[in-house]
Structures are given as structure tokens and as C-alpha cells.
């Protein structure tokens, strides 16, 4: 993913599909989503979101 800001575009699939795979089919869905996040990426004020809290509260 280019910037963490864009994770919101795929958040429905990540939360509603991947997070519930274990409960629906009894299988793990091991996924790594890599994206630059927070300050220090040199991307300006519009690409410096920190969305980690969303993922910490998803099963």
C-alpha cells in the first residue's frame, strides 16, 4: 500500500472478510499489510495518518 491513508479504501475487506475468516470457516487468514505510516515518510501532512488503533480493535 502506498500510504496508510489509503487503507480506508480496503478496510471493509480487511475487517469484514479477513478478520472473520476464522469464525466462518475455521481457518486462519494470516495477512501482512505493509504501508508507510505516521510522520517521517516525507509525504507531507496529507499522507501521515496513523491508523494502527483501527487494527488493534479488530479480531
Regions found by a protein language model. Give the residues of each.
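Conserved thiamine diphosphate
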Residues: 1-59
Amino acid at each position: 500500500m502506498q500510504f496508510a491513508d489509503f487503507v480506508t479504501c480496503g478496510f471493509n475487506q480487511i475487517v469484514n472478510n479477513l478478520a472473520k475468516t476464522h469464525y466462518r470457516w475455521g481457518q486462519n487468514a494470516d495477512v501482512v499489510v505493509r504501508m508507510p505510516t505516521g510522520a517521517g515518510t516525507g509525504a507531507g501532512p496529507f499522507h501521515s495518518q496513523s491508523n494502527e488503533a483501527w487494527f488493534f480493535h479488530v479480531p
